[in-house]
Amino acid sequence: MGHDLADIKKSFEASLPGYVEKKDPKSILPQPGKRNILITAALPYVNNVPHLGNIIGCVLSADVFARYCNLRGHQTFYVGGTDEYGTATETKALQEGCTPRELCDKYHAIHKGIYEWFGIDFSHFGRTTTDHQTEICQDMFLKLHKNGYTSSQSVDQLYCNQCEKFLADRFVTGTCPMCAYDDARGDQCDGCGKLINAVDLKDAKCHMCKATPEVKQSTHIFLSLDKLQQKTTEHLDRELAKEDNRWSSNAVGITKAWMKLGLDPRCITRDLKWGTAVPLDGFEKKVFYVWFDAPIGYLSITKCVLGDNWTKWWKNPENVELFNFVGKDNVAFHAVMFPCSQLGANDNYTVVNNLCATEYLNYEDTKFSKSRGTGIFGDAAQGTEIPADIWRFYLLYMRPESQDTAFSWDDFVLKVNSELLNNLGNFINRALSFVANSFGGVVPEMNLTNDDAEVLSEIHNECMQWDKQFDGVHLKDAVKTILNVSRLGNQYMQAQTPWVLMKKDEEGKKRAGTIIGVAANIAYHVSVLLYPIMPTISATIREQCGLPALPLFTPFPICYLKAGHKIGQPSPLFQKLDPAQIAEFKAKFGGSQDAQSSAPKTAEKPKQQKKQAPTKDKKGDKKMASTAAFVELEQGAKVISQLIAQNLKKFDQAKALFTRNQLQRLDGENKQLTIDVKTLQHQLIELETAAGIKQVPKPVVSCTPTPTSTPASGIITEAPKKEAPSTPAPSEPKKAKEQKKGKGGAAAAPVDDTIDVGRLDMRVGRIIKCEKHPDADALYVEQIDVGESAPRTVVSGLVRHVPLDQMQNRLVVVLCNLKPAKMRGVESRAMVMCASSPDKVEIMEVPADSKPGTPVVCPPYTHRPDEQLNPKKKIWETVAEDLKVSAEGFAEWKGQPLLIGSESKMTAPTLRGVHVK
């Protein structure tokens, strides 16, 4: 949409699109003429507590997408639950001294409570231990059996003589036969991701007792995946050929790799008691294996709430779009295994249309581990008293869509305090408080001008992007788009200065009323965009606006709050996170509490000497007594020494932790003070401007100092000018003589040859177009706008690190004064700046409102970029040695942050302490 004022006014004054209705799940059925969206989140094992990685990987991502679908008015049914059958449950029940049913009841309630606290809004959250599960699972199997897609054969299995049972694959560990990973499970290797048979493991061990199992034979049923490969391939090819398919890139890659290797018959039964019984003679003591049984849980859980109407969702492929949300380790089961079962049953099942898989979310620089005390689990997140919506926001901001990411407390604080508190929360409170304080809480009359049309048009463009991102399941990008909208709102208010206009004549006050009315409506529109991400905050904003109903999404920020509308009571949406409290959380969840492992062991008592026969030699008795006493004292001294050493170690650990926490607290307070000072400066300028005090810009001295003119303080001083002598000084006859001439014969300014970051020409750029290099599989060729008359061609080796779709229309930082170089026949005229480790490369990020061509500077080093860096002088190589990502994620050179323009910083998404190059 352009900035035509008449069109903008028409759109702004359009009628409301309707409201989102809260429906009884029993009434949610597919409807003709509507998009009917069926959403599933991978069913978690019921024997554990979900951590943040589990939550973002499936249930939260699916919840956000379901909420978006409801905002768009689609018929949406969202299914979730707990996977309760299998060896994992049996084993956990043994460990906890209860029955499998009791264990399932306990953990189902735990999962349900955690998801409710996180605001996960399932249409129904069920479980797999139901009669409906048995009925549908057995029915699908019997149809597969009848259609000739099953077989039986004796197989080698691992049997633990010590536990007296066949071992399920997940309860055998050993060395992977394919990649030699030494902690592979018996069903799948976490090292290479390939499925394996437990009997093929090297150095296999029973997970329960650590004994070495032996191989025994048992007769099992196999699903003939080889016979079903053609059907499944045809279905997958049709889905992936659709231009609007929403398969994540990792799901596509994993699926294609599986199909390319070819499918083999796979065992679907196990020697267990806790599971869905096999309805065939001779197999009464066996149950279905979890990979066959668990996905059927989606169907049975749907039947638990809809009854016989479950088939309207699950046997209706012509009218239903199925979206599966899974972690990358679940792709094969949802893309290959389960579709094979459905297609082989030949019962018109709704088969996967869109598979949305995430990579892994790690914790800081390690993995989530309940046993090691590392990472945040769902129940612990509640205990922090940080609201659930804050967790939702950060998890979605860091959603691992194309590569593994990591939860970082430092980044968590940064994003919450900067993006939520200072950006989004500041704008909402600012706009609504102005209505409350200057207009008595009543929305003023609005008469739009071209300035208003411009911001509304920009927000309309962002909202179109938001809709496209959500529809394509690019949830992380959608979060950043919302922040862009609130940033535009802040910039609009700042540029229009309604607080100044309020002090002018009647026309000025009317103009201020228009600005504040538009800002208040933008704030309400932000609440709609925010609903899928932060539903509670969205509701709070709508209540403060005095219009709590949730409208359907419209891409244009229409006038929800008409002139004369009475708003509610504005109040701050977010509280600043306290660095001291965060330091406590870092210690608590960092696995530093090793009290059990460091506790002193109980000292063994010295063995008593056997009583000697009585003797008359009293001297001998005394000698023996003194010897025994010496032994006891010596052993006691050793125990005391051990206790002292252990306590000293614990003291040193506590001291180090205390010191680290104090430093982090002081660092956090210092950063917050810097933000507070800037905020107060900004408020002072506003007040002085409102009072009519003229603002005089701070003078800037442009000079190029010599190395000696920059003192240690970093403040650049200009040396007093001297008249040039008529003849060169004796000490430097050549320098004066050889000084280069500028244009017109004038002497050029002295050149500072000091090698530092100021000689780099780094700028913000926007990738206009990116495509694969025609002659190199590992290279991209980008056209990047760096603020010049034409875009630059840049070749980057990012194919293995960043998907092609994420390279389009992306803001980057570009080094522009390297010598152009040909890379496989294409000349590259710049370099995209990335955080780089041996295993991972991330493009450095800049604020979404950054403009192409904006220079990247590093005060106090003078920005004086060479026209082209001389390769012989190794300027780039020298500077690059100290160009790194800080512990907080900022790019810095020798400890000084690199700034976009003069304020914002360039950041790495997850990498810390690595080089930028």
Curated annotation (Swiss-Prot):
Compartments in which it is found: Cytoplasm
GO BP annotations, alphabetical order: methionyl-tRNA aminoacylation
Known EC number: 6.1.1.10
Annotated Low complexity bias: 702-713
Example of a GO MF term: methionine-tRNA ligase activity
InterPro entries: aa-tRNA-synth_I_CS, Anticodon_Met, Met-tRNA_ligase_1, Met-tRNA_synth, Methionyl/Leucyl_tRNA_Synth, MetRS_core, MetRS_Zn, NA-bd_OB-fold
Motif ('KMSKS' region): 367-371
Gene3D superfamilies in UniProt: HUPs (3.40.50.620), Isoleucyl-tRNA Synthetase, Domain 1 (1.10.730.10), Methionyl-tRNA synthetase, Zn-domain (2.20.28.20), Nucleic acid-binding proteins (2.40.50.140)
EC category: ligase
Catalyzed chemical reaction(s): tRNA(Met) + L-methionine + ATP = L-methionyl-tRNA(Met) + AMP + diphosphate
Main location (coarse class): cytoplasm
Cellular component GO terms held in the UniProt record: aminoacyl-tRNA synthetase multienzyme complex; cytosol
Binding site residues for ATP: 370
Pfam families on file: Anticodon_3, tRNA-synt_1g, tRNA_bind
Annotated spans, Disordered: 591-623, 702-749
Residue positions of motif 'HIGH' region: 44-54
Keywords: Aminoacyl-tRNA synthetase, ATP-binding, Cytoplasm, Ligase, Nucleotide-binding, Protein biosynthesis, RNA-binding, tRNA-binding
Domain tRNA-binding stretches: 756-857
Listed Basic and acidic residues bias regions: 614-623, 732-741
UniProt similarity note: Belongs to the class-I aminoacyl-tRNA synthetase family.
Protein name: Methionine--tRNA ligase, cytoplasmic
Taxon lineage: Eukaryota, Metazoa, Ecdysozoa, Nematoda, Chromadorea
Gene designation: mars-1
